């Protein structure tokens, strides 16, 4: 019985280590291997596995609701994510930047 337990443990470990091996996500004609990221304009893509499925995660700037006394300042369009995203500056804190 202990040999069976060792064999099952070995196979489960091997499967966990090879999940997603050789697989990739497609983004605009290029492939991102599982476990890697790709920077593109103001987006960051990550190819990952989730419950034995290959998934593509995309991070991009969120729209912000600007409160009274604050203003939105555009980010540098040539900067990598998240430095390309706009920031919110408010009176009394960072207004004079």
From Swiss-Prot:
Contains 4 disulfide bonds. Pfam families: SVWC. Residues 1-20 form the signal peptide. One of its GO terms (molecular function) is toxin activity. It comes from the Eukaryota. Expressed by the venom gland. It is found in: Secreted. One of its GO terms (cellular component) is extracellular region. InterPro entries: SVWC_dom (IPR029277). Negative results: this recombinant protein is not able to act on sodium channels (Nav). Belongs to the scorpion La1-like peptide family. This is Venom peptide HsVx1. It comes from Heterometrus spinifer (Asia giant forest scorpion).
């Amino acid at each position: 019985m202990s040999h069976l337990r060792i064999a099952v443990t070995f196979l489960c470990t091997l499967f966990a280590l090879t999940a997603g091996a050789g697989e990739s996500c497609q983004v605009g004609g290029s492939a991102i291997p599982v476990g890697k990221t790709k920077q593109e304009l103001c987006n960051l893509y990550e190819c990952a596995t989730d419950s034995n499925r290959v998934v593509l995660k995309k991070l991009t700037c969120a729209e912000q609701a600007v409160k009274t006394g604050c203003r939105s300042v555009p980010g540098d369009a040539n900067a990598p994510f998240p430095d390309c995203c706009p920031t919110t500056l408010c009176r009394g804190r960072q207004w004079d930047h």
